[in-house]
Every structure is written in structure tokens, then in C-alpha cells.
Amino acid sequence: MRHMVWIGISLAAFATAAAGHPPPLLPEASVAALGDELSGETAKRNLEGLARLHRQRGSRGFHSAAELVAERARAYGLSDVQILQFPADGKINYGTQRARQAWDATEGELTEIRDGKSAKIASYAAEPVVLAEDSESADVTADLIDVGEGTQEGEYAGKDVKGKIVLASAQPEAVQDIAVGKFGAAGIVSYAQNQRTAWSGENDNLIRWGHLETFSPNKTFAFMVSLKTARLLKERLRLKESIHLHAAVEAGQHPGFYEVVTATIPGSDSELKGQEIAFSCHLDHQRPGANDNASGCVTILEVARTLQKLIGAGRLARSARTIRFIWPPEVEGTETLLNARPDYAKRIKAVVHMDMVGGGPETKAVFHVTRGPLSLPSFIHDVAWAFAGWLNEESYQFAATGVADYPLTAPEGGREPLRAIYSSYTMGSDHDVYQDSSFAIPAIYLNDWPDRYIHTNLDSAANIDTTKLKRAAFIGAASGYFLANFSSRDIAAAERAIAMGQLLRAVTSMQRQTPAAPAAEYERAVRGSLDEFNSGARPRTQRLKSAATASAAIIYRRLQEPRGPMTVFGYDYFADHARSAAIATPKLLNYEGSWGSGEEYAYEALNFVDGRRSAQQITDELSAEYGPVPLAMVAEYLRALKGIGVLE
């Protein structure tokens, strides 16, 4: 393995260096125009506006954010600026997404009553993140009881929590049915922590954004506190001290709308302007939610401003295809849009998706250009990497020597090199929806990870680097503009980008010891995607053919409805329907492979179903992508999908 790692380093260095002078894919005049006009500062000023808003789905704060984006888009001269509204009443289904009702809050205070005096512990007015999403109104005075993680019945043994408030380390949604539903607790105080990184626990003042289960019958409230506060409370409880709390909450779900902001730069070609290249992000999340994901929202807005201005000034030609910009609530908004408006799904040929693209050094963020899933081969990811790899080299040369033609730094930003990584497919944002086999729209995914402040009170504008915003905007703008003009004249240049991408994929295959046949078929399919894109055909997910024999011969076909991934946002289509059909949870969903989790195996297993592959072939593809997985697990999951009416 040591030798493989060194080979990987050498090839990666070659692939990046080779993307140096001159700029790839676009004329240098176009690259210079983009570099000159894109502004990280303009993007950050817009970000500061969004970060003041608590942008929960369907809320007044989200609507204000949508209005802010729409107003800017109109001011920048974009066309067809709209705030689309789709009813969300808790009953309507948009594909695999059950529409969650809107949620709003006006008050949330948690205080301790002690010796006739009150001391405030948490205030929604001061920090909205302290009140868990989907909390319901309450006016409760009760003792606090420590239940550990709060997810296992044994943690409640010998404790009288009925009518009390429980202190738990798990997310409120994982606690509410057992604490409130089974044992009668009045509410929850949670100190749930972020996704684990090297910096976990380092800052015990972080307050994590919390969630209650939207569709749980056990309605309640939950407050989020820092690890520091939780430790103090736990120690007092350990010493048998009574802690008396008062919770005052005015909040709740109500029928509302999913709001999706959209705008366009119309294409110029009479035959191609009906096709669209979309820029995507997600507009929701807690205040401040600066990197996640005000950064993605304002960066695609900056791309829109820049392209519109340069086209209007004649510095860039109007693109042949229409360029569309979309600002939805995360995942559920995209799932709703593509199901409620199938004309959008039909017109969009490719997506540039941005989710967390501005994290400065304080966040410890690493910038990724993330490839698509193995089930949907496409050259568009290599296009994005061509620009990112070139910018890696330019920014490094500037950092190392002070001299570079295109360092793309911002006046208020840093001068560090970009150090972008071309990463294998990872899940967790709206790109999952686009690339689901229901829609099969390839999506470039630009994203930061890790970020030690994600989903917390400290994900603030102060941690956003304007240079990072400008560079992310450049990679996105250059990629989207190239694709919006792509024709047979660009095939040779795109093939050079594919060759560079293939080198890096070969390194990954060597390190993971991936079987050669699936990798070779994938590369042929990537090359074939050029012709599909140019012809206007919809990308096909069924290009790969396993070299393995079909020892498990059963073949499934996905039904036309429902469309979308099985797990969306705040709703698990598979789990809900499996319960109704009395189907046990398939083992695949809890499987941990070499390079993927059960969620990823399940996502791709469904994507690989095409009416041609056998269960054995799907297993082989999954093993090549995420590591060896037993055929029995895959076959069980496919049978379960058939059982809930997704496959036939």
C-alpha cells in the first residue's frame, strides 16, 4: 500500500501541474474576464444579510431570505426571477418526500428557578439555534433528569421522568418517542454534538442545531445547550442536587409552502436554449449558518451577477444553453421542485451544486470537487476538476513565490493556496436528488469538509474567507459556462480533461484494489457521456456491465413512481413504507463497508437497478465503489424495495 500511495501522490501532482498555463477549456480572455469580475467581497456582503436570518423551512425567516435573494437577482438583471411556492401540509407527497409543514417560533426561553430567583439558560431571541426545530408551544415548570444518551430504555430504569424535563446527549429526534412517548417526559434538553472530526469536543461552547421528528405523534419541545453547560448540569445532578427549570415556548408547525427561488440567463441558440445548466445550493438552515449554506447561496448569486454583467458588456458571449439558478430548502425543496415541475427535470442537463464553499482557515475546511456516483458516469466532473486543478497550481505558485497570472485572491481574503481535492462521491446534499436514477442529472458538487463549526452557533460570517468564495465562484462559473456552450468543437478539450480525471481515478482504484473491469467500463461510459451531452440525450445509468457472472439471476426494474432517493429530508420513505408492509430493516442499511456506509450502499443499489443488471451484478458494482458487500444483503434490500412498491 505504501507504493500505491506514492504512485498516487506522483500522479496527482502531475495531473495538477499539467492543468497549469494556459487556462483549460475556455479562451484565456474568458478566464481573465471571470477572474476580474468575480468578487468575494460582494458575495460576503450578501452572505452577511442571509446570516442574520433563522432560515427554517417554510418560516418567516426563510421567506425573508428568499425575498433577499430574489431582490438581488432582479437588481443584477437576471430574467424570470420567481419565488415558486409548493404547498406543504404534512400530507402531500412530492415523489419520495412527504411535504413537511412549515415551522415557526416566536419565543423560547429556558430558565432555572433557584431560591426564588431565575437564571436564563437559553434564549431563542438571543440565539435561535437553542430551540430545536419542530418544537411545540409549552409552558412547563419541572425538574431536570439526566438520562445519558436518552435512546435506550435501560437509561430510564429507576428514574421517574413523567412530567419532567430530560437531559440527553442524543439529538432530540432520537429521544422524543422513548422519553416523551413511552415514559411521559414533558420536554428535552439536549447537548448533542456535531459529526465527529479531529476537533470534536475542543470548543465546549458550541451549541448544535437540534431537530425533533417532524411526523412523530409525541409532540414536545427541546432546547439545545453547549457541552460546557451540560457538564455543569450533569455534575450537579450527580451530586443529587435538584434542578428546577421553566420552559416557555411559542412555536409550532402549520400549513405553509416550500419556497424555491429561481432565475435565468436565457440561452441564445434557438435549438439549445430549451436545455439548461443549473446552479444549485440550499437556502435554509439555522442562524447564522454562514458556511452552511449562506456561502453556497451567495456564491451562485455572485456567479449569476458576474455572468449577466459580462454578457451584457460583451466580454462574454451569451451562452447557447440557458443558465438557471435555484435556491431551495435543502433536499426536500429540490425533491419537490423536480417532482412538482417535471419540466425542470427534463430541461436541466447538468448541475453545479454548492454547499459550504467559503470556510476560512479557522473552520479547518478542506475544499472538495466531488465526483458523481459510479451509477451515473459523466465527464462534467472532470470539467470542474480541470479548472480546480489549474487554480490549485496558480494559487500555490502565488503563495510560494508571490507571482502568478491568476491567483484569484480577494482584497479582504487570504492568500493561501486553494488545495482542492478531487474526491470520490459523498452524500449529504441536493446533488443526491439530481443524481438519483429517477432524474439521472449529473451534478458537480463543490463543498467544504470538515468544518468544525457546521450546524452550530459559531458558523458565522466572521469565519468566511472572501478569497475562498471567489475561487469557488470561478470554478463553478467557468464549469457552468463551458457546459452551457458545449458543442462538438469542445470534445477534444473535454477529452483532455477526462484523461486527467482518469489518472486520478486510476490512483484511487489502485489504492482500493478495485476490480479492473468495472473501472474500465466506467471510463468508457465517461467518454460516452460526451456524445450523449452533445446530442441532447438524457444520461443513462445503465452503461456499466459487470464482468462477474450473474450467479444471482433475479433482475429488477424501477417503477416510474415514486421518484427520488429513499431517504430525503425529515422523512424516510423506505422506513415509513417498510413499517406499513411489516418488512424488517434490511441489514444493508446498517452495513459499514471499506469506503461507504449503509446509506451510500442503499442509495447506489437502487440507482444501479435498470432492468438489465442482476442482483449479483449490482453487488459487484457496489463492491467496486464502496468495498466488498455480501450478495445476501443486497438481495434482501432489493426484495424489500419490491415489497414497498418501488421495484418490480
Question: For each of these PLM feature ranges, what is it?
Answer:
Residues S597-E648:
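Long, charge-rich, low-complexity alpha-helical segments
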Residues D465-D531:
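Charged, amphipathic alpha-helical linkers/stalks
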Residues I121-S123, T220-F223, A230-R231, P328-Y453, ...:
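Metal-dependent peptidase/peptidase-like ectodomains
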Residues W103-A105, S123-E155, W209-N291, E302-R305, ...:
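Soluble metallo-hydrolase cores and metallopeptidase-like ectodomains found primarily
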Residues H21-L26, A32, G40, E48-K162:
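Noncatalytic luminal/extracellular "stalk/propeptide" segments of secretory-pathway proteins
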Residues S30-E37, A51-R60, Q97-A99, L131, ...:
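Second-shell loop/turn segments in exported
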Residues R45, T306-T336, Y344, M354:
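Short helix-loop-beta-strand segments that form the rim/entrance of peptidase-like active sites
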Residues E48, R60, K120-F221, D292, ...:
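Extracellular/luminal Protease-associated
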